[in-house]
Amino acid sequence: MADTRGRWAWDVPGFEPPQPVVGAAAGMPLAPPTAMPRAPPTAMVARAAGADGAVVPVADRLDQLADSVQLAREDCLELRQEASDLLEYSNAKLGRVTRYLGFLADRTRKLDQAALETEARITPLIHEKKRLFNDLLTLKGNVKVFCRSRPLFEDEGSSVVEFPDDFTIRVNTGDESLTNPKKDYEFDRVYGPHIGQGELFHDVQPLVQSALDGYNVAIFAYGQSRSGKTHTLEGSSHDRGLYLRSFEELFDLSNSDTTSTSHFNFYITACELYNDQVRDLLSDSISPVPKVRMGVQESFVELVQEKVENPLEFSNSLKAALENRSANSLKVMVSHLIVTIHIHYRNYVTGEHLYSKLSLVDLPASECLLEEDANRDNVTDFLHVSKSLSALGDALASLSAKKEPVLSGNSRITQILADSLGSSSKTLLIVHVSPSASNLSRTLSTLSFSARAKNAELSLGNRDTIKKWKDVANDSRKELHDKEKEVLDLRQEVLGLKLSLKEANDQCTLLFNEVQKAWRVSSTLQADLKSENLMLAEKHRIEKEQNNQLRDQISRLLEVEQEQKIKMHERDLTIQSLQAKLKSIESQLNEALNSSDARSTIGSESASVISTPKMMESTADSSSVTKRLEEELAKRDALIEKLHEENEKLFDRLTEKSGLGSSPQAPSPSNKQTNAQGRDIGRSDSTKSQSSDVFPLPVSQDKAGNSGAIVKSSNELTKTTPAGEYLTSALMDFDPNQFEGVAAIADGANKLLMLPYFHCHRDYNETPPISDWCMVLAAVIKAGAAREHEILAEIRDAVFSFIRKMEPRKVMDTMLVSRVKILYIRSLLARSPELQSIKVSPVERFLEKSHTSRSRSSSRGSSPGRSPVHHHHDHGSRTSLIDEHVHGFKVNIKPERKSKFSSIVLKLRGIEEETWRQHVTGGKLREITEEAKAFAIGNKALAALFVHTPAGELQRQIRAWLAENFEFLSVTGGDVAGASGQLELLSTAIMDGWMAGLGTARPPSTDALGQLLSEYTKRVYTSQLHHLKDIAGTLATEVADDPAHVSKLRSALESVDHKRRKIMQQMRTDTVLLTKEEGGSPIRNPPTAAEDARLASLISLDNIIKQVKEVMRQSSARPLRKSKKKALLESLDDLLAQMPSLLDVDHPCAQKQIMEARKVVESLQEDPDEPATDLNSNTLGESEVSQWNVLQFNTGTSAPFIIKCGANSSCELVIKADQKIQEPKGDEIIRVVPKPSVLAEMSFEEIKGVFEELPEAISLLALARTADGTRARYSRLYRTLANKVPALKDIVAEMEKGGVFKDVRS
């Protein structure tokens, strides 16, 4: 039984174990089935077109959509089946748990009943045990006298006392005239000098046990000075006295007797009796504590009682009482010290309540009875001591003789301890004697007093009587032992039942937790199923819409495909006809070559003359086809050129201000020249002078107006657009793994990166072609500059995350990346005046003329040639961000050398000289572009030049430098090879190379423009933080004059702190800033300790001002009682005590507000506190209360108590109820309820008199057995009623702070 008692099992009556799930592995716990992971239906959405733009067939798209819908339906059915299985599993488990809980509830009820029955059987036995134990002590005598002798001191000589046995002390009187000079004194117990404190307390312990059983016990320590009285009671640090040993024994016995239905409480009182005047030794406590009455009704004293929970608290309280005792040794010798331990026992089942006390009294020195040489100063003290000790001796003698009544009215000590001297009380007198011969007279006097108290003769007494009572005591002891054994057995049985009950409760708790878990799992699954159904329905709706859109798109694509097929068919026919003509021409040519050699020269010339028109005709036909193809290419180039022109306009609109226009730019060369140079020069064929996407720097703005500009992150944007959301989603969801080949990835990434430039208010399902980008660009330009800034800010994080993600693949167009980053840097410059003062190096510092002649191969192999150019920055009003040395880009151009030999070779090869010149120029331009690109990689100084210099101005400066350093380019020419054309081509090649290099990343960091953007952004953040630091520092030193100024300063500092935290949060989430691993540097946050301290001080000052206003509001209420005025002044004093928590700058304002309020309160006239008069005149009219709130108190009777409460104009609690409960339909009375502080100093009878003026329900609800209990109940009732009245809630809170509502037990 003991082995299985602590285990939890299912095998109980009426409970079936859970059945395992079919297919589950043996030994595995029962768990709800889990579904296999499944791909979302949207994973089967049709993929985009490939790199060549081919369209997926319509049938395949529809089949994929049908498969997606089918998968969604299957997922929905699986989820529904899982939810059904889990619901069935939960219901089955809940049913089993419910049945088992019912069984446990029945078992718990039976165990409770058994425990009550056992308690009922034990209680009479415990009472019988206590009675028998008390009878045993009574048989031994209600008054016991012990005698104790201290050891001899070194200077006291020989001893005059002997100890024949444990009950007799023999004193050598030294009187030679007597036959036997030795006298014997018999006591209940005699202790020699060798007896310690422990053995003494062993005989005192039965009296302590009797005190715990409910009987009053008094222990007196009597004897001459320096005989050991104080040592017996107090002891030493290593050998405790009766004070501590008695309480420790009480504490241990109470712990062993305490059950779940009973409880012991201990209190201590200590007083000093001097000249019949009582002084409380524990009354120095500042906080109000409960008091207890001691003594007879005619002459009682009220002493402070302190509750002690353990021996340590008792020791501290006793130590405090002894320290408060008089320090005058003579006064201590003639005073009584009374230490009382009050014992309260309560049984919550039977309702039994017992009260007893254990009093330990340190009596004055016994020589006070013999002092004959008392002077005038202490004769009064000795007279009072003599009277007190004589009366105590008479009382003890009367008790020993079993005479009634006890003479308790003769002295103050007997009046205070009247309930401990007589009746069933137990009294112990411990007599202390000195063994020295010099103290013989005092020893004999002490022994004579104790013999008189014991009522014993100076003989051995009647041995027969003693033997008889000893036999009776032995019988009682044996009977007591049997009863104790029976009680012990019953207690063991109760402990076993309690253990079983605890185990049952633990099982109930476990099952209840299992039930809660099952309910949570069931509710979670139902919620998940519901959300899954909603999500599937939404997906189905979206797929349906997408299906409709795809159908419309497919229909349009079919039309376009049909048109393209027709055009392709026409083109095929044209090609076939041209091929036929070409074949005929070739055949004619072969015939001409195979003709006879004998023909004459004239015939040959005539044949060639005749064939020339035919070849010209066929050549004209092929040239027409070529011309058509060139026209289409020209249209495409013109479209791209228009696109870049519109792009340049977009850049200009982002930064241009009123009165500032863009710099003039050189016109671009013709398409003919571009096509002649070939397609290898990339994007320079159509852009020329517009090759770099840069725009003029705006004029400096007002610093005051833009000092608070903040670089906002994407999550801080307040306004979004549907198209911006689409672009963000497209950039973040771009997956390079969906493309086949690097070319396809590059094409998709570059097209996607161009979307931010051509953003309009419509959504794209696929990447739009270049023709659509032009229309988009026009729409963006039409939207205005403000809208463009919003669009840039909206997609900022997505753009830079996309660029960072694609940088390692090296597939993006670096010129396009440069344009994007320059766009964002200039947008930042337009909003940040602190960046507009940055000075950059001129373009001449980045160009250097090569002085060495080297071949093209050597130039390509060692390019770019760089030489350091040292220069000094201007440290004037403008600042420089790029402080590194600027290196020059070496331009290696040689003049063209014309030779007749090369012209002859070209003519022999059939190549026109102009065509060859264009070919050579294109190769040289490509070489310069590559060198310029390599030079620009990671060059932040060059990046700053591009950002801060307009595009047209930068290209003009490059052309001017080329014309100045290469004089052979300055010759005027009218064709493409002329100076003007060459300067334009060279400057464009350098610009394109630099632009491409600035957008090329250099791992592990990013490209030069990205590094520059990171540094600019950090500078903006740092400027904003320092600006907020300056504002906060100014506010922190400003002196507050009045409450409005305090509130304004606090609000301003909180606003600045909020902005600073917001900026720090933006810095942590900004994707532009480079991390430490990427080469970025951290931003230091300026210290804000002083500002934080001032803000905390202002918050405290604001709270103090609010409390001052509350005091002023309460002081305006009439009438103003004296107690309320005192409470208000104390509240102001508390506020003055809170001033050290403020800074020195806030002290004047706080002190001014408090002192003004104090003057107002002190100047008010108060009404005296007259509770009786107020209660007699507290009848009001119902019209004075604007609103009544009804409360119903259910007390277990047939009719509940109904009380209506409200507030009058003086903010006092007013109630309306029946005057008598027995007459519920009688007249209702209206009374003002006094505050709990009114009853603080009233007696119990006075409180009853106050309640007689109120409705009877108040008396029944608040009246207790004692005054303290009544005050505690009334405080809770008053708080309950006042909390129901809205107008009194603030007053109730103030009363709680003032400690008016305080339980007596606390």
UniProtKB/Swiss-Prot annotation:
Compositionally biased tracts (Low complexity): 855-867
Coiled coil stretches, renumbered: 466-507, 540-595
Domain (Kinesin motor): residue spans on this chain: 142-456
Taxonomy, superkingdom: Eukaryota
A Pfam family it matches: Kinesin
Region (Disordered): 592-627, 657-710, 849-881
Example of a GO MF term: microtubule binding
Keyword line: ATP-binding, Coiled coil, Microtubule, Motor protein, Nucleotide-binding
Binding-site residues, ATP: G223, Q224, S225, R226, S227, G228, K229, T230
GO cellular component: microtubule; microtubule cytoskeleton
Gene Ontology terms: biological process: microtubule-based movement; microtubule-based process
Compositional bias of kind Polar residues: 592-611, 660-677
SUPFAM superfamilies the record matches: P-loop containing nucleoside triphosphate hydrolases
Family: Belongs to the TRAFAC class myosin-kinesin ATPase superfamily. Kinesin family. KIN-14 subfamily.
Protein name per Swiss-Prot or TrEMBL: Kinesin-like protein KIN-14L
Species name: Oryza sativa subsp. japonica
Gene behind the chain: KIN14L
